[in-house]
Amino acid sequence: MADPKFQNLPGIAYDQPDVYETPDDPETDTSDYYEEEPENEAIERMHISASAAHKRFSGATLEGSVDFTDRIGRRPGRGYDMRGAGEYELVGQGEKETPVQKCQRLQIEMNELLNEVAALQVDRKIADEEKQSYDAVATVISTAKKVLDTLKLEQVLGKEQVPNSKQVKALISQVEEFKQSGVLTAIPTPGTDLASTARVASLEQRLYQLEKTVGAQPEKLSRLNAATNTTNVLEAVRQLSTKAALLQPDKLDTIEQRLTTLAGKMDSIAEKSSGSSQDAKRDQKISELYDIAKRTEPVVEILPHVIERMQALESLHKYANNFAKIIAEIEHKQGTITTSLVNNKELLHSVQETFAQNLETITNKVAKVEQRVTAISTAK
């Protein structure tokens, strides 16, 4: 019933219950069809794997100095500290490597390659030429590894970019030891082929053997060339051997007989000669032919050998021509790399200046913000 104090008031219903219940609505038929929203490129959908995340942070440790906040400061906050005893972690697919990670990965790969080359050098089944090529490859890898050890990442990137880990400290100690030793190594070009390097090493070894056999004194070689009228050492040796063969005792008698016969013929020709102009011209032509025959006599004997030698050296000349082209191409690439390094250095300098200016501007703005926050907190 209604409360007695509400009696005799307009708008009050009497003889009716105080609680009213609305009837239940009939259940509407609902479908299980779910309309998928169209994909939006502005919304990033990240797919995180729990197992991959567990493996990624399985060796992480926390210390008292960690900071996961996003506060603005000169140095970024420290989060998880990945510590490992000489083990390097490779980045995932699609992730960008840091310079330190690249340096560590290259060191590991070079050590593995050196071990493989050393194992191949010890193998007895490999021929000597292949072992020499492996020696040249090992030399190139050792030089590249030394150059990699000389990189000063802390001076180039700054102390904030290079973490203070055991690997980086060991790398810095190796750089200091190499600096104190005073040994300078040439930086190999990135586009150098290992096969061409092996061929260059083989050619250098053959050149050393040739100098050891013939001699590397230019004075003696110039005198030999002047005496034999040729710049080819093999041809000069063949001429000397031919002349020495003519001076043998069994051939001196034959030469003497031929000279005696020739002298008799010359005497008979001189007796039959007359003072006419036709005879004089004929004698002049005969003397010229005789001089030509005398000049070409030693060449006629060695000419077949010279032709055979030239045919044998044809492949070597082609190989030398190809080698000269390769050297010219390497020099061109080296010049291109040098130019790109200069441009990159200038670009790095400009980026550093811009970064320093931006950092100074940000520092000033942060200081102003902190002053304003301090003033507001003081005013409250």
UniProtKB/Swiss-Prot annotation:
The keyword Cytoplasm applies. Residues 21-40 have a biased composition (Acidic residues). It comes from the Eukaryota. One of its GO terms (biological process) is mitotic metaphase chromosome alignment. Residues 1-40 are annotated as: Disordered. Keywords: Coiled coil, Cytoplasm, Cytoskeleton, Dynein, Membrane, Microtubule. Residues 100-135, 353-377 form a coiled coil. GO terms for cellular component: cytoplasm; dynactin complex; dynein complex; membrane; microtubule; vesicle. It is a peripheral membrane protein. Signal peptide: none annotated. PANTHER family: DYNACTIN SUBUNIT. Subunit of dynactin, a multiprotein complex associated with dynein. This is Dynactin subunit 2. It comes from Drosophila pseudoobscura pseudoobscura.
